[in-house]
């Protein structure tokens, strides 16, 4: 979760360590007359994908990873009540006009690249923005990490025994033959040195626990690395693992429909129907 340390300090807010604290902070911000969240789903032909990430994060924080796996594989139907509840949990943030910049009607039409800029306006349009490690590339020119912005782990519930789940995507390197050069390269890629060569170039985050963190190009990536290697559960982006017609189709559009007023149950039913149609 990205935020402005100055905005937090000016308002006496502390970084939440649990989901309970995050929910309480969200309400407190709104009560103080501040808007807690910037959320934007617009992404051209991929509009809706940021909301699928919210859903995946919530599923990992409300149910064991086995339930997440069942959902992603459709062993558990998309319209199971657990999934509907997760969608409505997202709605707690996105559908409350007091909680989101521009009101709930702006969520679907606000560009995902533009939505975090509300952190940096004067006065700020929002206090927090949930997005992956790449998003600083779209922050306004001249803002400085650790000064103008920082981040904290999107927290888990203290009341649920689910550890510290982390959601992510990534690059997989696969050997297509076993000739000596390929074998040696694959062996090299297992060593910290291989990762450290990329770490210093920026834009690269590794789950390798044996690397020297000082090799990262910034404190931001050192902090993100700590979140990644500190995960008790890691799961790959669910929509990326689903069939394309769902994960890059009905799931995207369904989340837009939800933010535009369609019920979570109707959205979940429609997504499940689209999945049934390709089986």
Descriptions of predicted regions:
Residues 26-28, 72-108, 154:
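Glycine-centered hinge/linker elements that transmit conformational signals in sensory
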Residues 1-15, 20-23, 40-71, 167-174, ...:
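Periplasmic solute-binding protein
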Residues 199-250:
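Long, aromatic- and glycine/proline-rich binding clefts that accommodate carbohydrate-like moieties
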Residues 9, 33, 228-279:
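Conserved C-terminal helix/tail region of periplasmic/extracytoplasmic solute-binding proteins
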Residues 41, 45, 60-85, 141-144, ...:
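Short, solvent-exposed loop/beta-turn-alpha elements that line the ligand-binding surface or hinge
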Residues 19-23, 104-121:
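Short helix-initiation/N-cap motifs at beta->coil->alpha
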Residues 134, 140-205:
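Extracytoplasmic/periplasmic substrate-recognition and gating elements
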Residues 33-36, 122-131:
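Alpha-to-beta junction loops
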């Amino acid at each position: 979760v990205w935020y402005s340390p100055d905005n937090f300090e000016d308002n006496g807010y502390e970084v939440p360590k649990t989901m309970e604290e995050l929910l309480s902070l969200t309400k407190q911000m709104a009560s103080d007359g501040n808007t807690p969240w910037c959320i934007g789903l617009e992404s051209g032909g991929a509009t809706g994908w940021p909301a699928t990430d919210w859903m995946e994060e919530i599923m990992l924080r409300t149910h064991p990873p086995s339930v997440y796996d069942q959902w992603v594989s459709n062993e558990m139907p998309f319209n199971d009540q657990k999934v509907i509840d997760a969608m409505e949990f997202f709605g707690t943030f996105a559908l409350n006009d007091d909680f989101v910049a521009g009101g709930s009607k702006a969520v679907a039409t606000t560009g995902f690249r533009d939505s975090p800029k509300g952190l940096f306006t004067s006065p700020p349009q929002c206090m927090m923005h949930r997005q992956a490690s790449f998003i600083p590339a779209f922050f306004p020119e001249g803002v400085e990490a650790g000064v103008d912005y920082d981040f904290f782990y999107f927290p888990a519930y203290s009341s649920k025994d689910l550890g510290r789940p982390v959601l992510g995507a990534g690059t997989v390197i696969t050997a297509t033959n076993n000739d000596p050069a390929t074998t040696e390269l694959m062996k090299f890629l297992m060593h910290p040195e291989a990762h450290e060569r990329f770490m210093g170039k920026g834009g690269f985050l590794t789950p390798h626990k044996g690397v020297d963190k000082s090799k990262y190009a910034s404190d931001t990536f050192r902090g993100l690395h700590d979140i990644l290697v500190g995960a008790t559960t890691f799961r790959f982006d669910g929509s990326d693992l689903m069939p394309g017609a769902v994960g890059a189709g009905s799931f995207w559009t369904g989340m837009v429909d939800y933010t535009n007023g369609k019920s979570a149950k109707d959205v979940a039913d429609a997504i499940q129907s689209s999945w049934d149609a390709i089986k």
